[in-house]
Amino acid sequence: MSTILDRIKAYKLEEIAARKAERPLVAVEDAARAAPAPRGFARALSTAAATGYGLIAEIKKASPSKGLIREDFDVPALARAYETGGATCLSVLTDGPSFQGADDFLRQAREAVKLPCLRKDFLYDTYQVAEARALGADCILIIMASVTDSQALELEAAASHWGMDVLVEVHSRDELARAEHLKSRLIGINNRNLDTFEVSLDVTRDLARRVPEDRLIVSESGLYTPEDLADLARYGARCFLIGESLMRQADVEAATRAILADPLTAQGGV
C-alpha cells in the first residue's frame, strides 16, 4: 500500500523530468549564478539560538492532511508580517500538487524581506538544487525518509556548490544515524510522520538528546504555544519551524510575536 510520501515522490520524479525537458540544466545554472548571494540561513539560526529561539516561519497555503490552510494568501504581506513579528528565517512551500505552493511564492517572499529563505519541497535531483538557488533560496531541505544515502550526499554537495545551507530532516533514530554522515549542521526533527501524517512532540523529546552537540536542532510540526517551545528547549531544541499554527491566524505578525514570548510573561508572570 503506497503512502502519501510514495505518491509525492512519484509525481515529483515526473515533474523533474518535465522541467528538465522544458528548461535545460545549463539555463538553470546560469540563473543560479545570477541570483543574489545567499543570506546565511544556518548562521542566522545559530545567532538567534545563542540568546533565545531561532524561528523558521513557514508560508504554507495547504497540506495533504489538512487541505486549504489559508485562503487570504498574500505572500509578500505574510513574509513581512513574519519578519516584523520576529522570525529568524522563512520557509516557503514550492510544491504545487500537495501544498498549493509555487516557485513564484519563494521569489516574492525573498524580495519582500531581508530574512534567509528555505525552499520547502521534496528534492530528489541536483537539478532541483540549482533551481532552488535560481529562485533565490538560501537553504534547501533534504528529507531522509524520501532519499537514499547517496542521494542525500549528492544533494548536500550540490547545495554546498551553490553556497546554500541544508536542513536535514529526520523522524526516527535510524534516519538520525544516517543524517550524521552528512556535513550539515542543521538537523530538523519532524514531529510529523510523513507516512501517516500523525504528529507527536515525543519525537523531538526522544531524538534531540541523541543529536551530536555540534549540530543545531530544529523541531518541526505540531508547535502551537510558547509552552511547546519552552518544553522542547529543555531537550535541546532552540530552533523551530512553524507553519500551520501561524498561517491559521488572522494577525500573523501578532501570532508570531506571541509564540516567541516567554511562557511566564505570556501568562502574566515574571
UniProtKB/Swiss-Prot annotation:
Enzyme class: lyase
Enzyme Commission numbers on file: 4.1.1.48
Domain of life: Bacteria
Keywords: Amino-acid biosynthesis, Aromatic amino acid biosynthesis, Decarboxylase, Lyase, Tryptophan biosynthesis
Catalytic activity: 1-(2-carboxyphenylamino)-1-deoxy-D-ribulose 5-phosphate + H(+) = (1S,2R)-1-C-(indol-3-yl)glycerol 3-phosphate + CO2 + H2O
Pathway(s) this gene product operates in, as recorded in its UniProt entry: Amino-acid biosynthesis; L-tryptophan biosynthesis; L-tryptophan from chorismate: step 4/5
Alphabetical GO biological process terms: L-tryptophan biosynthetic process
GO MF terms held by the record: indole-3-glycerol-phosphate synthase activity; phosphoribosylanthranilate isomerase activity
Family from the record: Belongs to the TrpC family.
Protein name: Indole-3-glycerol phosphate synthase
Protein's gene: trpC
